[in-house]
């Protein structure tokens, strides 16, 4: 199964099991875990105040493990199925800055040119933070007014890594408005003396 998943996905799944699942069920074999145990575990997670989408993700990972054991190791049934799910699969709609809110915020970054440029790029292009952190000068075409997104930054096991995008659709070219081209020229000139 591991060869089908990205390294970051494997690390995240291990993290969830090591911190959220194993400590609670470490004294029981899978075949000893009952629906009531799952419900008690779910209630403990809910008390911790995790986001509904995170609760759903944790619950789904344990349910998937039980499904795997039912399918391939003759476990009689999946207690997660009987216990039902927790959380929700869709996050609440994101709250974006209005243009006015962004204009009011931006001057607070005037003494921090790197942060100012980062916020400008994030706001006006919609790129993800990992995509921004992986950008190189070669990804920016000031003449054609576009930025090529073809990689992402991640921190895996304490190491900085540049990885391919999560999906093929994440590879894209983003058009940038003329004023942002001018901001980028000024910023690159400051950095590289160009």
Model-found features: residue ranges?
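Secondary-structure boundary motif
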Residues: 3, 47, 71, 111, ...
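Basic, Lys/Arg- and aromatic-enriched nucleic-acid-binding interface segment
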Residues: 52, 56-58, 71, 75-135, ...
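Conserved tyrosine-mediated DNA breakage-rejoining catalytic core shared by Y-recombinases
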Residues: 85, 134-193
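A conserved hydrophobic position in a structured secondary element of the catalytic/binding core
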Residues: 33, 97, 175-176
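Extracytoplasmic/periplasmic beta-strand context in beta-sandwich domains
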Residues: 28, 36, 78-81, 95, ...
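N-terminal core-binding DNA-recognition domain of tyrosine site-specific recombinases/integrases
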Residues: 1-76, 91
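Generic recognition of well-ordered alpha-helical segments
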Residues: 15-19, 40, 60, 64, ...
